[in-house]
Regions:
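Asp-box/BNR beta-propeller loop motif
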Residues: 1-10, 53-65, 105-117, 152-165, ...
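Long, acidic/polar, low-complexity amphipathic helices and coiled-coil-like
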Residues: 1-45
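Short coil/turn segments at the loop-to-beta-strand junctions that recur within blades
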Residues: 8-11, 68-74, 120-125, 168-172, ...
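Repeated scaffold domains used in trafficking and secretory/extracellular systems
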Residues: 21-28, 72-79, 123-130, 173-176, ...
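Entry beta-strands of beta-propeller and related beta-repeat scaffolds
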Residues: 33-37, 84-88, 135-138, 206-211
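Residue-level signature of beta-propeller blades and closely related beta-rich strand-turn architectures
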Residues: 41, 92-94, 143, 215-217
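Structural motif
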Residues: 45-51, 96-103, 146-151, 219-228
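Conserved blade-ending motifs and adjacent loop-strand segments that build the rim/top face
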Residues: 167-177, 184-193
Length: 255
């Protein structure tokens, strides 16, 4: 059974190059809450602010709420953790030098009203966002060479952030610098020289958070095919290295 969402389709956020696939993160469909973010751009005839439309009865009735007068949005993320508490992230004002601004909103009344709580930890382009609950969330940015990590964590809903540090491990003896002599100890690659680009964390129904640390686009260790898998069972307070494994970065699939 399908339900009609009372939104002009031109105001929805689509994946790049698509006219039918909604942008990942811009909508939520569960048994208890259905929500779509739209607007934040110039429509064909008028400005449409960043707006959330949601239903608590599987599409029978809909409520809309305008969040912000932003008209150059590029990224959306919406999630609800129970019937009352939810979060929205809006990325906007992207520049040619691959910078972007962010606003983080929270609701405690099911989506009726929203409060701006923060602007994110950095202005890089987002790879993705994942919240565990109304307090704990992760911002993962596209990696650029020279970055000291691309994964950040908040414990207060988005007011403040800290960089996620994953425990280093030992590499085997084949991990040598491509420009250095294999006889010089200082020329051996270290763990964080190889595994440096985090993918967006995931969380399972038991609350276990998983992060894959990849080699980025220029990886050469194990032909660039392996990633390091880490997990946390305490909402990101501590992390345990699981193993190295082959992974496809684009879809987080592993072998």
């Amino acid at each position: 059974m399908y339900a009609t969402v009372p939104v002009d389709v031109e105001n929805l956020m689509y994946e790049s190059g698509s006219t039918s696939t909604l942008k990942d993160g811009s909508y939520l469909i569960t048994t208890s809450k259905t929500a779509f973010l739209f607007g934040g751009r110039m429509g064909s005839s008028k400005k449409v602010p960043v707006t959330l439309i949601y239903s608590d009865d599987k599409g029978v009735n809909w409520t809309s709420c305008e969040l912000d007068n932003i008209y150059n949005a590029e990224d959306y993320y919406v999630d609800f953790f129970d019937e009352n508490n939810g979060v929205i992230v809006c990325g906007y004002a992207r520049t040619d030098n691959e910078k972007e601004s962010y606003r983080i909103y929270q609701t405690a009344n099911g989506g009726e009203t929203w409060t701006t709580v923060g602007s994110g930890p950095a202005n890089y382009i987002l790879k993705g966002v994942m919240y565990v609950d109304e307090n704990v969330g992760f911002f993962c940015y596209n990696y650029a060479e020279g970055m000291d990590g691309n994964l950040y964590m908040t414990k207060d809903g988005g007011k403040t952030f800290s960089k996620v540090t994953l425990p280093e491990q030992e590499l085997d003896s084949t991990a040598k610098s491509s420009t250095a002599s294999s006889t010089v100890a200082d020329d051996e690659l270290k763990w964080n020289d190889v595994y440096k680009e985090a993918l967006v964390p995931t969380v399972d129904d038991k609350g276990i958070i998983t992060v894959y640390l990849t080699q980025g686009s220029d990886g050469t260790y194990n032909d660039g095919k392996t990633a390091a898998k880490y997990q946390s069972s305490d909402k990101g307070d501590t992390w345990v290295f699981v193993r190295q494994l082959e992974i496809t970065q684009n879809n987080n699939k592993h072998n």
